[in-house]
Curated annotation (Swiss-Prot):
This is Cytochrome b. Coiled coil: none annotated. The cytochrome bc1 complex contains 11 subunits: 3 respiratory subunits (MT-CYB, CYC1 and UQCRFS1), 2 core proteins (UQCRC1 and UQCRC2) and 6 low-molecular weight proteins (UQCRH/QCR6, UQCRB/QCR7, UQCRQ/QCR8, UQCR10/QCR9, UQCR11/QCR10 and a cleavage product of UQCRFS1). This cytochrome bc1 complex then forms a dimer. The chain crosses the membrane at residues 33-53, 77-98, 113-133, 178-198, 226-246, 288-308, 320-340, 347-367. One of its GO terms (biological process) is mitochondrial electron transport, ubiquinol to cytochrome c. It comes from Eschrichtius robustus. It is found in: Mitochondrion inner membrane.
Length: 379
């Protein structure tokens, strides 16, 4: 008798994706982040669902409904902070996952990579609209500043901004629609993640060497299920440490002040995971130029497969490319730091230099380094 997991129409799909999936025998812990992202998404949907039961998307009551959740709802405070810090963990896993893909040449799987880029945009949109919901000072002004960027679009800009706002300023209509978007987008992310997996399972996983592993594959279960469990344990432990010991470490104190359209905070800045893009936006003294640079800083990922000039897939055996990759990581960390600083003399010039270096590395230096490595290998 054949096992039910191999014959049942539904269980067969799960079996082929998580049990009998042929997996390279040499993938490292950098391959854990995919499953961790799935775990983060499930946690965010669940905590978000319970928060939505008590939240009111109305300008007069939104802020106090968050206070009510934290003070009066049973374990409301932990649900709220798990959700807020869960977003940070989500982005840590997301950036690690993307970095791994870039380093080991996973962008050779074009479809999987492109769905991944779309997923990144969707997750960023979800996080942005979600940050507006507590209706604190930073929520309100962050929404005002970022949505206002649309006005840089020639001819239709102003109309577009007012259309997004649902009025002449960020108000009740904006908050209500942002709540609607924040509720629906995670389910779109879930659907896209399934498509991402479908495309990945068409080709099979990459591995650190970048060499096809078809002759040495092992079943996903039990080998990688147990390995993913360790990653999940570490993720949950980190999230709980953050939530229980320093829940406001990554938040902004300004968001504990109710939104006031009449008083602007001294430094308007987004959450830490958007600071690198915010620094790129601010480093260009022209509105439209800044918006284009902001968009390109993320969209550039879609062009990575076309910019791959090396004859080797992975960076494992390419020291020049490795060096430039870590320079890129350092550059992004610098941009993240700059994004959180005021627009003053030393920070501005450092931000501009780091922004130029970011595009230079991806568009010029890394492809050229790959060509030099090809020559050295006599390929």
């Amino acid at each position: 008798m054949t096992n039910i997991r191999k014959t049942h129409p539904l269980m067969k799909i799960i079996n082929d994706a998580f049990v009998d999936l042929p997996t390279p025998s040499n993938i490292s812990s950098w391959w854990n982040f995919g499953s961790l992202l799935g775990l983060c998404l499930i946690m965010q949907i669940l905590t978000g669902l319970f928060l939505a039961m008590h939240y009111t998307p109305d300008t007069t009551t939104a802020f106090s409904s968050i206070t009510h959740i934290c003070r009066d709802v049973n374990y409301g405070w932990i649900i709220r902070y798990l959700h807020a810090n869960g977003a940070s963990m989500f982005f840590i896993c997301l950036y690690a996952h993307m970095g791994r893909g870039l380093y080991y040449g996973s962008h050779a799987f074009r479809e999987t990579w492109n769905i991944g880029v779309i997923l990144l945009f969707t997750v960023m949109a979800t996080a942005f609209v979600g940050y507006v919901l507590p209706w604190g000072q930073m929520s309100f002004w962050g929404a005002t500043v970022i949505t206002n960027l649309l006005s840089a679009i020639p001819y239709i800009g102003t109309t577009l901004v007012e259309w997004v706002w649902g009025g002449f300023s960020v108000d009740k209509a904006t908050l209500t629609r942002f709540f609607a978007f924040h509720f629906i987008l995670p389910f779109i992310i879930l659907a896209l993640a399934i498509v991402h997996l479908i495309f990945l399972h068409e080709t099979g996983s990459n591995n650190p060497t970048g060499i096809p592993s078809n002759m040495d594959n092992i079943p996903f279960h039990p080998y990688y299920t147990i390995k993913d469990m360790l990653g999940a344990l570490l993720l949950i432990l980190t999230l709980l440490m953050l939530t229980l010991f320093a829940p406001d470490l990554l938040g902004d104190p300004d968001n504990y002040t109710p939104a006031n359209p009449l008083s602007t905070p001294t430094h308007i800045k987004p959450e830490w995971y958007f600071l690198f893009a915010y620094a790129i936006l601010r480093s260009i003294p022209n509105k439209l130029g800044g918006v284009l640079a902001l968009l390109l800083s993320i969209l550039i990922l879609a062009f990575i497969p076309m910019l791959h000039t090396s004859k080797q897939r992975s960076m494992m055996f390419r020291p020049f490319s490795q060096f430039l990759f870590w320079v890129l990581v350092a550059d992004l960390l610098t941009l993240t730091w700059i994004g959180g600083q005021p627009v003053e003399h030393p920070y501005m010039i450092v931000g501009q230099f780091a922004s130029i270096l970011y595009f230079l590395l991806i568009l010029v230096l890394m492809p050229v380094a790959s060509l030099i490595e090809n020559k050295l290998m006599k390929w």
